[in-house]
Amino acid sequence: MATIALTLFGWCSGCSFRLEKKDFLVVLLLSLLRAVTSFSLLIAYQNIATGVASTIHFMYPLAVSLVMMYFFQEKKSLWVMFAVSMSLLGAALLSSGELEAKNGDTIVGLVAACVSVFSYAGYIVGVRMTRAVRINSTVLTCYVMGLGTVLYFIGALTTSGLQLVADGYTWLIILGLALPATAISNITLVRAIKYAGPTLTSILGAMEPLTAVVIGVFVFKELFTLNSAIGILLILLAVGMVVFRKQKS
């Protein structure tokens, strides 16, 4: 549904969806990385505690920073590495909890969470450092999500099969996940990577667990602990530090 919505938006905006052969191969690889990220996270959440899986996944800013510094000659910065470390610690505090999940395989969960780190880091770097950077953000997001849907469809047919949704309430939930949580977040992610760069985008991505905590407290009446407060403070300091240094430079 998110792909359909973005495609309609692209057509209404006058976007051209034509890709060159070389561009298609790059987009296919990015789609594979994005699909692997989502799939590995699902496996991780099924086998280990959600907080632990999220903490491991949010090591991707560190992976992005290291790749950009050592493979693409991005200027090494102690400020950036310090900010990454602060955001990792903040995410860990926000997601802290038990390791094991009920009826889960801990080893499988840990491996899957680690896979999500590198696949997501590869996707973020790939959007900026390949031919994909020249493709319109809406068009690129449409192709990545569309090809990812095809990959999931094939995977579903070869494993557990597809489950049709019948009731309207579930469709409303799916619609809510498809538009603001998937379509909008993915297209803004691509634009951020192109204009702000992979490293800054990945550090700002640490705001995601912070947002989850805020919604959990004010909407679902979850407890707000000392760990949550410290985690939020560390993430805000990390983001503020990077933005301030970026403006100063």
Regions found by a protein language model. Name each.
Residues 1, 56, 79-82, 115, ...:
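Hydrophobic core positions of alpha-helical segments in small-molecule transporters
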Residues 9-14, 41, 60-85, 210-229:
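C-terminal transmembrane-helix exit sites in multi-pass transporters
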Residues 1-4, 55-63, 107, 114-119:
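Membrane-embedded alpha-helical segments of multi-pass membrane proteins
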Residues 6, 28, 67, 76-98, ...:
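Hydrophobic transmembrane alpha-helices of multi-pass small-molecule transport proteins
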Residues 3-29, 42, 47, 70-82, ...:
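Membrane-interface interhelical linkers
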